[in-house]
Amino acid sequence: MLVNTDINLIKTLSTLFSIGCLCSTLAHAQKIDCSSPNTSSMKKICAENLAESREKLTNHYVTAFLVSDAPVHLLEDTHTLWFKRLQQCKSLACYKQQFELRIEDLNFYTSLNQSLTNHYLKFENGQIASQPVHLQVHQLSKDRIKIEGIAYRNPNNKLETQSIPFLAYTTPEQKSEITDNEHDCKYQFDFNKAILSVKTEQKGCERFVGVYRIYD
């Protein structure tokens, strides 16, 4: 007959085994498949000189999945978008830089409380936009909101021109009229449950215009 100590030990071992299986499954699911690289970009991504970067990325992804309170679909979709950008690289420096940038993103999801942040990705015709845009709406306090954004460009550009930043501060009462402090662009934000519509009448500010879906 099992005593309580034995039962607790079995429960602990079962839990550890389950966690181990989950980690293994996640690592396998998100590990870059280098079993048969059939394109020029995949051959470069799967080369030995990026082995350490691939392993490091896999470990950070599993950690983010297990620890972060960010929505799972957000982790998955941003990872897919990142991989598409990675495949556009034309130099070893670009590949290494993109691995490091993705690891920074995963660390952000892991280290910060995401429960007070709403994440939005831009959609076109029911699909994530071909030129991806990611907006984050942070509830800093009951009367203070911070909106950050990033519009992705060519990863082969210089680091400072690989993306377009967005930054604004507002209040719950003034959430519809937003000014991007980065470029002095004025936008109309229409929050409607799972959908965010962004409009502007200013020329040169169109990059962030569009329809976004929330990740929750």
Specify the residue positions occupied by each region the protein language model found.
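Bacterial N-terminal signal peptides that target proteins for export
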Residues: L2-L16
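N-terminal signal peptide c-region/cleavage motif recognized by signal peptidases
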Residues: L22-L26
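Boundary at the C-terminal end of the N-terminal hydrophobic targeting segment
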Residues: A27-K31
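Amphipathic, heptad-repeat alpha-helical segments
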Residues: D33-S36, S41-L75
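Contiguous, well-ordered beta-strand patches that form the walls/edges
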Residues: K84-L86, A151-K193
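Tryptophan-anchored aromatic micro-motifs
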Residues: S111-H134, Y212-Y215
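N-terminal glycine/threonine-rich, aromatic-flanked beta-hairpin/loop signature
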Residues: A129-F166
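Edge beta-strand at a domain terminus
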Residues: L159-E173, T200-D216
